[in-house]
From Swiss-Prot:
Keyword Transcription regulation: no
UniProt keyword annotation of Coiled coil present: yes
Annotated gene: arc
Protein name, entry field: Proteasome-associated ATPase
Coiled-coil ranges from the UniProt annotation: 20-98
Pathway the protein acts in: Protein degradation; proteasomal Pup-dependent pathway
Species of the source: Catenulispora acidiphila (strain DSM 44928 / JCM 14897 / NBRC 102108 / NRRL B-24433 / ID139908)
Length: 594
């Protein structure tokens, strides 16, 4: 037993020396447990002493378990504190770092070096090994560290200044551009622009990064795109009624030179440069121009045997070209003809269509408060004359005031062919009605019964009755009484002011009446009474439209030329009843704004 006491005292000494360390305490307790176990074995013959030792062992084991759990919690706390300290240190180091700069990659010079542009200077710097060789592209944005070494690569610049392309230089990688104040700059073409395959044209708007001198992309200019519609309209000559003679003339002027160029060359016949379509409103001028482009595309495809042949229809909205800034309208006209030349150089026929031509190209010197036509007209004249040596381009103009267009535009050699689009007569009106009133429409049973159920005969009879109502010289059809300057008077009927647009409107009114009858009385189908009633409604609606304040100008727009008109009196009794005519007040001086 004395030996065992010595072991306990030795263990107690070790415990005292390690009281400040939890690990030392655990070791001490484990050793004491081992000593007690030995004592337990030695005291196997002494039962009472063994029970006391066993109780002591259990107490020590419970103490060890508690200290172990406490130790694990302390270890976890220390680990968490260490992680927080490391994160804070990293954050402090990150915040203490100097700012990173950006530059534009210019060229890879090998051996891990590259030329960049940053801070207004061109520099040769090292490239980080983390960036694979050959991945940097000219014009690309790169990140620089404190030592101005390339450490990361990004995309390409997406903001900057808008410049206008003047020309591509011989090396193909640089271009001459003009800025806002017409200053000229030589810039580099960024790789995305070179690889995009976009054909750069003089006048294109480009995105430039002014500090590095790179241009990155072509910016569409809405001011030009809105004025030009390159799609060929899906309208054929079959959809146009009552204008067979005019269609034949324009086909001879436009299609023959492109379909049979050898015959024209053999006869030394020069194709016409332009066509003027003139006449009163609503008679199909714009419709014919659209059909020309569609028909020309199909004819060229038939002759060449290829479905890939295109024709281009450049639809120029006249009033939208006008700009208050001097030279802007002329610039737009140049861009339009520049685009026409580009398309024509590819072998495709191009039609440049000016709608409402009188709004742009008025007679020079006729302006009251503006003289823009003094420069716009010469610009068009020079462009048309410039088309002389260029094949596959023709100019088509449409106007209802051809008397206001400058005579220099209308002379032979510019707009060679002049086609008047007349108001439809009775036969033409039947043809136009036939485009809108067809056998596919639902027809009333009573009307069908009158013609033995034959839909074609029913439609023909309905059109015949409607045209007779419109073109008969009866009192209900009297529209205006005009007084000329020489005192003569003339009665005009609604037929004198009929148009394809009015006929379409009459048919639409009749169809609407048929729908209302079906909803109210459950009687389905179009009737001749609907068409006749629509004629009356259309005539009534047009009663107040004649301009009695300046009847001569109104008559010119409506297609009535000749002796000057001084008075107009409407003969249709309107809602107010009585005479609605007014005489013309003669004013000595109206000033420049009237």
């Amino acid at each position: 037993m004395p030996a065992h006491d010595d072991d306990i005292r030795e263990g107690a000494g070790r415990s005292a020396r390690g009281s400040d360390d939890l690990a030392a305490q655990v070791t001490y307790l484990e050793q004491e447990i081992a000593v007690l176990r030995r004592r337990l074995r030695d005291a196997a013959d002494a039962p009472r002493g063994g029970r006391a030792v066993e109780e002591r062992i259990n107490e020590l084991q419970a103490t060890v378990a508690g200290l172990t759990s406490q130790n694990e919690r302390l270890v976890a706390t220390l680990r968490e504190a260490r992680d927080q300290i490391v994160a804070l240190k990293e954050e402090i180091d990150r915040l203490a770092q100097p700012p990173s700069g950006f530059g534009v990659f210019l060229e890879d010079v090998g051996e891990g070096n590259a030329d960049i542009f940053t801070g207004g200077r061109k520099m040769r710097v090292s490239v980080s090994p983390s960036i694979e060789g050959g991945t940097l592209r000219p014009g690309q944005e790169v990140m620089l560290n404190e030592a101005l070494n390339v450490v990361a690569a990004f995309g390409f610049e997406s903001v900057g200044e808008i410049v206008s392309l003047k020309e591509i230089l011989e090396d193909g990688s640089r271009a001459l551009v003009t800025g806002r104040t017409d200053e000229e700059h030589v810039v580099r073409l960024a790789e995305p622009l070179l690889e995009s395959g976009v054909k750069l044209r003089p006048g294109d708007a480009l995105l430039m990064e002014p500090r590095s001198g790179y241009v990155y992309e072509v910016i569409p200019k809405s001011e030009v795109e809105d004025l030009v519609l390159e799609e060929v309209p899906d309208i054929s000559y079959l959809e146009i009624g009552g204008l067979d003679g005019q269609i034949e003339l324009i086909r001879d002027a436009v299609e023959l030179p492109y379909l049979h160029p050898d015959l024209f060359k053999e006869h030394k016949l020069r194709p016409p440069k332009g066509v003027l379509l003139y006449g009163p409103p609503g008679c199909g001028k714009t419709l014919i121009a659209k059909a020309v482009a569609n028909s020309l595309a199909k004819k060229v495809a038939e002759v060449t045997g290829s479905d890939n042949v295109k024709s281009y229809f450049l639809n120029i909205k006249g009033p939208e070209l006008l700009n208050k800034y001097v030279g802007e309208t002329e610039r737009h006209i140049r861009l339009v003809f520049q685009r026409a030349r580009e398309k024509a150089s590819e072998g495709a026929p191009v039609i440049v269509f000016f709608d409402e031509m009188d709004s742009l190209f008025r007679t020079r010197g006729s302006g009251i408060s503006s003289d823009v036509e003094n420069t716009i007209v010469p610009q068009l004249l020079s462009e048309i004359d410039g088309v002389e040596g260029l094949e596959n381009v023709i100019v088509i103009g449409a106007s209802n005031r051809e008397d206001m267009i400058d005579p220099a535009i209308l002379r032979p050699g510019r707009l060679d062919v002049k086609i008047k689009i007349e108001r439809p007569d009775a036969e033409a009106a039947k043809d136009i009605f036939g485009k809108y009133v067809t056998t596919e429409l639902p027809l009333h049973a009573d009307d069908l019964a009158e013609h033995s159920g034959d839909r074609q005969e029913t439609v023909t009879a309905m059109i015949q009755a409607t045209v007779e109502r419109m073109y008969s010289e009866i009192d209900e059809n009297r529209f205006l009484e005009v007084t000329y300057a020489n005192g003569d008077k003339e009665v005009m009927y609604f037929r004198d002011f009929n148009s394809g647009a009015m006929i379409q409107n009459i048919v639409d009114r009749a169809k609407k009446s048929a729908i209302k009858d079906f909803l109210d009385h459950k009687q389905k189908g179009l009737r001749v009474s609907h068409l006749l009633g629509a004629c009356v409604d259309e005539f009534k609606e047009n009663e107040d439209l004649p301009n009695t304040t300046n009847p001569d100008d109104w008559a010119r727009i409506s297609g009535k030329k000749g002796e000057r008109i001084v008075f107009i009196r409407t003969l249709v009794t309107g809602k107010r009843g009585g005479d609605t005519g007014r005489s013309i007040d003669t004013i000595a001086s109206t000033g420049q704004y009237l």
